[in-house]
């Protein structure tokens, strides 16, 4: 996909891989919505990136919050051409540790953000992309999911993280096949 003049949402965009991705897209002439819960860092990055960037305070696991980020991209830049899913958390906790069994709430939180949040963003972004006109190459959009080697080779204390990233890996191909057809 041609990056110049295309509109992208980068989740987890205020730090780490997400911030690096947002900077790279902006450097190539893309317009970027930095979607993240960290308002201070997100606003600072959007300001750094200039007029072609916006910040959306976004909880990827919330339908309303995710939809607001998609709506911002469409209203600010006229459409949506790409989504890069970088949002995620890694909370290390053993299945059975010194303090007892792994907290179910911790496991659920990691799955909710890393897996369900990724799915949530994909479904909403895909719908927005489907409303746009194809570019000169016939493309309507692109979605990039980030996973981890932990999906295939998780380590001690990574049950929740490995399961969440394994889920991202597992859903990416069937969704890609569906959206490509």
Predicted regions mapped to residue ranges:
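Conserved glycine-rich Rossmann-like NAD(P)H-binding loop of the short-chain dehydrogenase/reductase
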Residues: 28-45
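The beta1-alpha1 cofactor-binding region of Rossmann-like NAD(H)/NADP(H)-dependent oxidoreductases
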Residues: 39-40, 56-68, 104
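Residue(s) in the substrate-gating loop at a strand-loop-helix junction
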Residues: 148
